[in-house]
Amino acid sequence: MAFQFNFSIEEDLENKLTSLDDGTCVLESQKGKQDKRQSTERPGLPRDHSWKCSSLGNAASSEDTGSPPPIADRSDDPEACKHQPSWKPAKEHVMPKDVNHVLENTVLEMLPGPQHANTAVVKTVSLKEKFPGENIVSKSFSSHSDLIPGVYEGGLKIWECTFDLLTYFTKAKVKFAGQKVLDLGCGSGLLGITASKGGAREVHFQDYNGLVIDEVTLPNVVANVPLQDDSNGKNEPDGKRQRKSEVGREICKCRLFSGEWAEFCKLVLREKLFVKYDLILTSETIYNPDYYSTLHETFLRLLSRSGRVLLASKAHYFGVGGGVHLFQKFVEEKGVFETRTLEVIDEGLKRFLMEMTFKHPS
């Protein structure tokens, strides 16, 4: 298996990390700067050892079997997610049976800082060579833009609010064990990967762009599962075979999706006995007020009644107009969710961590 680790951080404008006072390294955020090009529309395993992953989406959950909630549950209404037009049909990206090949010809780098020890991510600047020609990679880098209307929504970068939320997970000792988790607008997938490492029973990753899922999210998921040697399992001690089995389970509990939120919503709700998410994680997804209706509807339809959303955002996004206060006002007017500010980060552009829960959970 030939894949390359690169332990230095490229000083490229399109993939530049800056250090905060606490040592956290973040990418310079164009989502917080005015840019005329910004969008105004939405959105290791042993060799020769294959893992057959089956869907976990129909697993039973006691939290979703109670009496009907006072707020109408519209999950069976095919019209409910049609408030805005869809630019990207949703699809599930099937996990490869043999994930050994996922990291072939992929350049990885380690995230800096002790709080991200042993976390490897795709070096996205290397994708320019892997995908020459006209595509979202070339368009993003050539236009120096992270938001291309209806084409690309920033999934190739790790945004600074993602690191804010990762830091909060540690400080607040957020519990993931036994939870069904959605990393919404996942990009690198670091939030979902952290949940998986924390013992989540199932983790779903969603991003607007399929290429981001295939070339960034999936490799990151595979790279952060404990890798074993290349032996085929014959004549191995029982302990080693058990570890391989555990790696397989880690991979199999992850599912990956691409497409616009409303389409993703409809796709997963087609599943029989769909079990809603206990926890939805999302970072820098409220930058455009035009998306608020669809995002709110997604939370309403996919979140367990006793679940919560953990959301990270800048106070305001210049150029597109969204931000925490405008989104909170939108949520309050809807009257479905309660919002609570968990933390305010004043370094650089002001940023917020927020929790959303149902006003009437039962």
Curated annotation (Swiss-Prot):
Q: Which reaction does it catalyse?
A: L-histidyl-[protein] + S-adenosyl-L-methionine = N(tele)-methyl-L-histidyl-[protein] + S-adenosyl-L-homocysteine + H(+)
Q: Where is this motif: Nuclear localization signal?
A: 237-243
**Binding-site list for S-adenosyl-L-methionine:** 158-162, 185, 206-208, 259-261, 283
Q: Name one GO biological process term.
A: regulation of ribosome biogenesis
Q: Which SUPFAM superfamilies match?
A: S-adenosyl-L-methionine-dependent methyltransferases (SSF53335)
Molecular function terms, GO-annotated: heat shock protein binding; protein-L-histidine N-tele-methyltransferase activity
Residues bearing PTM Phosphoserine: 62, 67
What is the annotated localization of this protein? Cytoplasm, Cytosol; Nucleus; Nucleus, Nucleolus
GO cellular component terms, semicolon-separated: cytosol; nucleolus; nucleus; protein-containing complex
Give the Tele-methylhistidine positions (modified residues). Answer: 144
Predominant cellular place of this UniProt entry's protein = cytoplasm
Enzyme Commission no: 2.1.1.85
The reply to whether Transferase figures as a keyword in the UniProt entry is yes
Do the record's keywords include Methyltransferase?
Answer: yes
Q: What are the start and end residues of every segment in region (Disordered)? A: 18-88
For bias type Basic and acidic residues, the affected ranges are 30-51, 73-82
Assembly: Interacts with GRWD1 and members of the heat shock protein 90 and 70 families; these proteins may possibly be methylation substrates for the enzyme.
Role this protein plays: Protein-L-histidine N-tele-methyltransferase that specifically monomethylates RPL3, thereby regulating translation elongation. Histidine methylation of RPL3 regulates translation elongation by slowing ribosome traversal on tyrosine codons: slower elongation provides enough time for proper folding of synthesized proteins and prevents cellular aggregation of tyrosine-rich proteins.
What is stated as this protein's family in its record? Belongs to the methyltransferase superfamily. METTL18 family.
Protein name per Swiss-Prot or TrEMBL:
Histidine protein methyltransferase 1 homolog
Q: Could you tell me which species this protein originates from? A: Mus musculus (Mouse)
Designated gene of the protein: Mettl18
